């Protein structure tokens, strides 16, 4: 009888990855990053444990969307007060807080429970090419080389 091995928390090795979002499509980048955060790229993947790695996303202000989504895609938030709904287009949010677009896309692809919140803490998103995590020596993660050449 084969037994399924569950990795102990001490045996999980976490790496740091650097993703350049310049000229990447939002959804395609988000699925790959969510998979790495979750740990699905490792043979020790366990659905109920945090086996994933840290991911640093840079150049969030240069991410793109296909079609006319820049003008049509809406981001909504609510203050909790009556009449407190705020609606903003992709382009307006891109100008104001481009990090939030990437964070929201990736967060929606993580589990919607305590594990997902723990995984989301390992995501670091920055507007420009600089980030304060150079001491961790992140490895460059190639997502889709064909998309970046367009």
Curated annotation (Swiss-Prot):
Name of a matching Pfam family: Ribosomal_L13
One cellular component term from this protein's GO annotations in UniProt: cytosolic large ribosomal subunit
InterPro entries for the chain: Ribosomal_uL13, Ribosomal_uL13_bac-type, Ribosomal_uL13_CS, Ribosomal_uL13_sf
Disulfide feature: none
Single Gene Ontology MF annotation: mRNA binding
Keyword check for Transmembrane helix: no
CDD domains assigned: Ribosomal_L13
Region described as Disordered: spans on this chain: 129-150
GO terms classed as biological process: negative regulation of translation; translation
Biased composition (Polar residues): 136-150
Protein keywords: Ribonucleoprotein, Ribosomal protein
Membrane-spanning segments: none
The family this protein is said to belong to: Belongs to the universal ribosomal protein uL13 family.
NCBIfam families linked to this entry: rplM_bact
Biological role: This protein is one of the early assembly proteins of the 50S ribosomal subunit, although it is not seen to bind rRNA by itself. It is important during the early stages of 50S assembly.
Subunit and interaction comment: Part of the 50S ribosomal subunit.
Entry protein name: Large ribosomal subunit protein uL13
Protein's gene: rplM
